[in-house]
Amino acid sequence: MSSNQELVVLGKLGSSHGIKGWLKITSYTDSVEGIFDYSPWLIKEQGVWREVKVAQWRFQGKAVVAELEGVATREHAQMLTNCEIAIMPEQMKDLDDSEFYHRDLIGCEVTNINGYNMGIVDQIVETGSNDVLLIKANAKDAFGKAERMIPFVPEQFIKQVDLQGKQILVDWDPDF
């Protein structure tokens, strides 16, 4: 199948639930049930990625559980515990021009409107009100910063995003 780097990880399989092979699901999608909008899933079982399809799923209290095709026993389900759930990138939904997947922003070079290179996006932190770019500063940062946190607020702080060129233009003081 595909290498791990090409895949988009959407969640992971949790512990078994019941005796018929159901599994708890940890979803990294915006809504917990959003993970079920994608099919087939890829899971890494014994070092090999393979396709699986969800036969059915449901909410179980605050958790989400699913039955996977071909997994009919508790023992088989237990062997899948902690396996990542991934999809191929082409399965991702198309976004509007003003929307971005976090994975596409990671690795972008961030420059402020005065031309100062702020560093590289290392991760995105979800705060509830807006996402925040965690920027790993250059080793020889003139302001002695190791990292910066810039709110991802289009127009106010984020002036331009060029995914092809892996560039983000921001209105942000490098000393802040």
Curated annotation (Swiss-Prot):
The keyword Chaperone applies. It comes from the Bacteria. The keyword Ribonucleoprotein does not apply. Pfam families: PRC_RimM, RimM. GO terms for cellular component: cytoplasm; ribosome. Its main location: cytoplasm. It is found in: Cytoplasm. An accessory protein needed during the final step in the assembly of 30S ribosomal subunit, possibly for assembly of the head region. Essential for efficient processing of 16S rRNA. May be needed both before and after RbfA during the maturation of 16S rRNA. It has affinity for free ribosomal 30S subunits but not for 70S ribosomes. Binds ribosomal protein uS19. This is Ribosome maturation factor RimM. It comes from Shewanella frigidimarina (strain NCIMB 400). The gene is rimM.
